[in-house]
């Protein structure tokens, strides 16, 4: 089942009702007293309002980076640190064969050289409040579709109201605790964001897929951008050459002091999605369907992309971002399933549900908001398994995979604004913008053929549209022959072709394929939606039952891409029966670089090998160890979306940027195991060292003024 349709929930405590200290993704405006007191006990040294509320609160320096990552403002002139992989798509879009910033890196020596990225934005959270009573009054007795429409309407109303005070603000209404709570969050978005600095990809993505989700790591996963603002108001503005660097309300102080084992560490960012209240039945479906399908289909997609990317530099640039994104979640799903099995997560969760059932029985709970029917929930998941499988294969195989099929979807769904006279529908037409520089025809054809063939081999016959009969009867089940014919006869990829609402368009074989696939999806969802709604109602009750059973404990909501704080400590963990070190050094990076002749993921430019071997680390070396420390571990609770999250010490100073989790914790989206789960961060001193010694970015270092 899609993450977006399931579970805005809370904590999963397996085998115990007690919450571990170093667990949780906490909203800041209503941070429980017990959590703040525990933070202080572990080494946090600032007043509570320095987290949220004061003008110079730490949270005011943290940003949502373009809707998929996190970041932090580090200077009075709007300079932003985030991960290299967060800036990856922007860097890739700015790169050309002649100016390959992805391969060679980039440093703007002046404001004038900073490169605008048209697709980036950053958001600052200005305020958050609980509006649950208001929402519950509006949605009482409504179904899921009606509730969604009401929430959208309320969001628009609140945004319209706030814009009468400040037109640069907007409000988002989000469900928390699986729909048991609703918060309204006020944001301010800045659209003019420019690339300032990036290391070469060989360093920003050092280790590649070989090291992804692994420890130890030596990746310099950072990139630097700047926010620009209206010169008169210091507020958001569309890109203009007249815009000036933004003067932020607050920025994070950058520390050169580093960290020691068991030091306090805190992340603040925008974690995307967790499902820690998910029932054992939901975890089983996640393992057997969503994750398994994702791995199986992406095995094929990744192999096809790599084949063409290895042949041609232009194709590499076209598909590199797609490849990296796809590979990341492919490996995540593999690791998550292994973790689910290795710790017996489904069994543990079933035992915990039995505990909840005993509590409900002993207390004779009659509240319909709490009295979950676990047998009904189990049956609902069984009944939803087939449509869930079809939906998973459909999404992985067809949505945003092939340029031709995606264009067919866009026309079929009316996603492209018609051109021509508004008073004469027969003269109106749809025309695609020329994006031929973004994709490779041969790759697209092979991908379409492979996805259609794989879909047919794994989905029941009842869910295969008519096109599969055509491929069988007219093309002898030869998917290559079919796609050769399809691409030769469809106008979907013909530059500047105009699609009118007429027989020619309806008879286009590409359009016909798109219509059949969309109709299939609608057919699947017609029967599936009612199951999803029923599942969500029972999961919602399960969440509330846990909260009420553990009334004496604070609970955090599942991640939903709103700002969250997580705290913990610096430290390693047991790997294969041995204690891992909690940081890596330049020496370990050099050793891996030496393997670059045989392993592409460890191959770097010679200057990088020279820099790290020279050991001219100066003020960036750790004062205790004397080493250049590169990456480090904490037990902060993070997930996707936390990439780029600032990592603060107990004094609220920036010591690193979170960029990954470890292999042994890949089930953390549904279960946080404090013994295994680790946040991997890039040491801010390694970031500054590369800016200094490789980039010679003196003006930026003066602006940041690390202490």
Which residue ranges define each predicted feature?
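Terminal presequence/propeptide segments associated with secretion/organelle targeting
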Residues: 2-5, 10, 17-707
